[in-house]
Amino acid sequence: MLTDRKGRRMPGGQVEGETPMLKTTGLNLLSGCACCEPRAPFAATPVTRRSILAGGAAVLSAAAVPAAAQAPAKPRRIDVHHHIIPPVQAEAIVRNRGGNPVKWSVSMSLEDMDKAGVATSITSVQNPGVWFGKVDEDARKLARACNEYAAKLEQDHPGRFRSFAVIPLPDTEGSLREIEYALDVLKAEGVALWTVYSGKYLGDPAFVPVFEELNRRKAVVYTHPTTPDCCGNLVKGVPVSTLEYNHDTTRTIASLVFGEGKTALRFPDIKFIWSHSGGTLPFLTSRFEELAGRRKQEFPNGAVPIFRRFYYEVAQGNTPGMLAALFHMVPMSQVMFGSDFPYREAMEAVQGLANYKLSEADLRTIESENAYKMFPRLKPA
């Protein structure tokens, strides 16, 4: 049973307090499930003479920060990559994998959003979602509890949160039921999927019934990388999230486009959002074009026109080199704002975009306008 700091029981559907740090033995979840370790703002920092002087220097240098990087008085940004950690999910992760979930609370989310001028965050649960290696009723119940938690969060903070529903893939039947409930009853903005499930990438034919239903609904599918079965801990001392997450996004995109299921070609009405500026995809387009050229009958126009149909958010993909590669591959209309909170602060993405010296019009397009087009319920009246 999960309890808050006052010892009160915290059921899965209750939005209260913070995700407790569950003390167990085993691997820390940050090494295998989360995006990466949280940055320093979430750790305590002692007050010293040096820190006071550094703070004064920061104030004096504030004018050097580009105006676009300052959080506006009226929040405008829409964050499509913002994790929540429902207590019921945290408990399931500890029970199945061990370790301590990263610290998270609703107030932490709101504080970070306010600091960065984020009007609304579309939430998704943290890795690994609800998949712990078994197709069973527990995964279905956990998905339902997480989605109802997210819906309660929306009700408690109108306008600040929306959600991408988690579904119990690779359980096809359970996933179809949860899609119906989450989209029709809870009114989620779309579905969150992970790049791979027990070695099966999203283009695997086993998932065709799910994508067929999502295509019928013209649904939004937000995706997030996870630890691939093929490639964990290949380089000693380098976390999987550092090296493999971006590659795994590219693997699953390749499976959707070039795999035997031809999912991306068969179901063009699904709106895919890829994390982290598309992983390594923007750097490998010439190789995929060469592959498409060898399969002219299937890809008469090449691969890039298909990649340009997808959407990409910029969390942890907002350095000048990554943005340059992304903007070379797709137009501004396909790029969205994302933070990867609580593993990164939203201001990191704000600053990254500002450093690229985009026009005000392009910034508005990325930070809000594209989201308003995809999610019209978010647009201010």
Which residue ranges define each predicted feature?
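Short, Lys/Arg-enriched N-terminal segments with co-localized hydrophobic residues
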Residues: 5-20
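Mid-to-C-terminal alpha-helical segments outside catalytic/metal-binding sites
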Residues: 17, 22-63, 71-76, 80, ...
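Hydrophobic faces of well-ordered beta-strands that scaffold small-molecule active sites
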Residues: 78-80, 121-123, 163-165, 191-193, ...
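Catalytic metal-binding/acid-base residues of hydrolase active sites
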Residues: 83, 226-227, 258, 278, ...
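Acidic-and-aromatic substrate-binding clefts and catalytic sites of carbohydrate-active enzymes
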Residues: 102-103, 131, 169-175, 198-205, ...
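Aromatic-anchored helix/helix-loop segment that forms the rim or "lid"
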Residues: 103, 251, 295-324
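Active-site gating/metal-coordination segments in enzymes
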Residues: 125-253
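Aromatic-lined glycan-binding groove of carbohydrate-active enzymes
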Residues: 270-303
